[in-house]
Amino acid sequence: MTTFVDRVVLHLQAGDGGHGCVSVHREKFKPFGGPDGGNGGHGGSVSLVVDPQVHTLLDFHFRPHVKAANGRGGAGSNRDGANGANLVLKVPNGTVVQSGDGTVLADLVGVGTTFEVARGGRGGRGNASLANARRKAPGFAELGEPGDQIDVVLELKSVADVGLVGYPSAGKSSLISVISAAKPKIADYPFTTLVPNLGVVRVDNHTFTVADVPGLIPGAATGKGLGLEFLRHIERCAVLLHVVDTAALETERDPVADIDAIEAELVAYGGLVDRPRLVALNKVDVPDGRDLAEIVRPDLEARGFRVFEVSAATRAGLKELMYAMGELVTAARAAAPPAEPTRIVIRPKAVDDAGFTVEAAPGGTWVVRGTRPERWVRQTNFDNEEAVGYLADRLARLGVEEKLGKAGAQAGDLVRIGEREFDWQPTLYTEFVPGVRGGDQRLAEKSERPSATERLAARKARRQRPEDEAEADEPVGDGEE
């Protein structure tokens, strides 16, 4: 069974927010206790964090579906629901987070680096939080907002200073095993190395990391062999070391041709041309290997390569090679821009942008896009007339109706906000009219809704009624005595 996985697809689902509660306080001798519905809890978010003890994406290979906890719903007596627990996933250093279309969302380098991939939904407000001077006992509450749902691709790019490249069976694994404490699998057949191996090299004041990747063959940059899958592991390397087999049995191969073939693959892959190179002519302990190394060395040096004749078996020439790698790594680190100190700034969550746009769509439909309008629609219970009326008030105060009118929308046009569609009625007056709890008189049938004249007459009748009752209570006399 494989123990190394460097690419997985994750299906992430953040927690949904809990619904707000509709409740009215009931207690003896308190006939008007008022609303006491609590707010729903926020859903849990999904984050990635770099852990130094994790070296592979194997866990996600077997569990690709991840979901955070939902927020709990509110309850009466002003009891707020509990927030859903945030889910933190541990990933190796050097993990790249990409969206489904290949867009890089984050490059996680450095222990403790954290990235929030999916944010939990906001909890809905209970009717106690929605009460105001005019709407003293709301008969509705907000729904919890759904959490983010996203598919991401995680790719591991090993974080190493020196990358060992070369043909299969060139001796890369043997070399890394003697210059570091790494224990890769070593055998006398090609493609023994199937996963990258990392080792830490210490020589005097130099300490650096070396990566041994599977052997490359012509066409690796286009997918042949194992090169395409593992070439990304040397993208972060500051130095590349060509490991060349001087004792190869294939008569048609020679060290110069091997280096030319590997260089062609590195150029085809892209992004590796500017890295400094070293050449290690390996297996010079073999007589034929020593003779071949002496023949090709002048040609390689004429091309600008620093060449070292080494033997992983006898450890000949390894000291000079490690010093050269350490010097190049130190120079690369000095040339790199200084890392800015990390400042931890605690800020509240950003307030939703109040901006929105109104666009005409085919078929006489108008589309309203904006953070606030879309969130308000998601949190509205459309089975409750009073909640729908509250949504109409909020959209009107935000200026949605005014902007629709200026854009040319007509009564009865279809308006889409988020995933909901509405028939626009600009004549609906936007003032809360108290009525039955859970209802809104503005949404009643037109024949049932009293006109302004009828409402004025009703108010006059209510004022006149106490005067009529007072006159009826006056005693009636029998005349003069």
From Swiss-Prot:
Residues that bind GTP: 166-173, 191-195, 212-215, 282-285, 311-313
Keywords: Cytoplasm, GTP-binding, Hydrolase, Magnesium, Metal-binding, Nucleotide-binding
PROSITE patterns: G_OBG, GTP1_OBG, OBG, OCT
One protein family per Pfam: DUF1967
Molecular function (Gene Ontology), one example: magnesium ion binding
Biased composition (Acidic residues): 468-481
Record's keyword annotation contains Glycoprotein: no
EC class (word): hydrolase
Region (Disordered): 439-481
Skewed-composition ranges (Basic and acidic residues): 439-452
Superkingdom of this protein's organism: Bacteria
EC number: 3.6.5.-
Residue span, OCT domain: 348-426
OBG-type G domain location: 160-330
Stretches assigned to the Obg domain: 2-159
Cellular location(s): Cytoplasm
Binding residues annotated for Mg(2+), in chain numbering: 173, 193
A single GO cellular-component term on record: cytoplasm
UniProt keyword Magnesium present: yes
GO biological process terms, semicolon-separated: ribosome biogenesis
Cofactor needs: Mg(2+)
Protein family according to the UniProt entry: Belongs to the TRAFAC class OBG-HflX-like GTPase superfamily. OBG GTPase family.
Listed HAMAP family: GTPase_Obg
Biological role: An essential GTPase which binds GTP, GDP and possibly (p)ppGpp with moderate affinity, with high nucleotide exchange rates and a fairly low GTP hydrolysis rate. Plays a role in control of the cell cycle, stress response, ribosome biogenesis and in those bacteria that undergo differentiation, in morphogenesis control.
Subunit and partners: Monomer.
Protein name (Swiss-Prot/TrEMBL): GTPase Obg
Species, as recorded: Salinispora tropica (strain ATCC BAA-916 / DSM 44818 / JCM 13857 / NBRC 105044 / CNB-440)
Gene name per UniProt: obg
